[in-house]
Amino acid sequence: MGLDMYLSARKYINKIDWNKLDRAGEVDYDSATFPQYNEIVQAAGLQDVQQNNEIYGANVSVNCAYWRKVNAVHNWFVNNVQKGEDDCGEYYVSQDKLLELLQTCKNALAKRDPQELMPQAGFFFGSYDIDEYYWGGIKYTVEQIERLTKLKDFDNLSFYYQSSW
């Protein structure tokens, strides 16, 4: 029990290669389907969910970062992404917001100033002390976001934050 924090990345996978679709004749969506689309749907065991040709893609979601009791970073998400609502909901995080968090963490580390990212009190949220665990959580956040920004598909990903406590 405690504050668990998750960042997931989602990507839309097209089902249809529109360049291969013969629109002059009878439309055959199966012949224009990207093979990886069917592989993804089958790997997820969802092939029976989609039963018509009106579905043109799927969203794939992967957990890409996890924090445990890094309440200062959670506080940042609550105030900057969740509009002050600390409700364990799932919230969209734009690339700009991730870059803003990255810069805030870097500033805090460079100045050794916790005023940039203040800890948040909460039931089972962990320590409020500004100690090595606090700075380790900030450093870990920098490492995770920098890793994500270096992905070739960074601009094509949608990110979502959710906490559990």
Task: Give residue ranges: language-model regions.
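Acidic (Asp/Glu-rich) sequence patches and key acidic residues
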Residues: 1-165
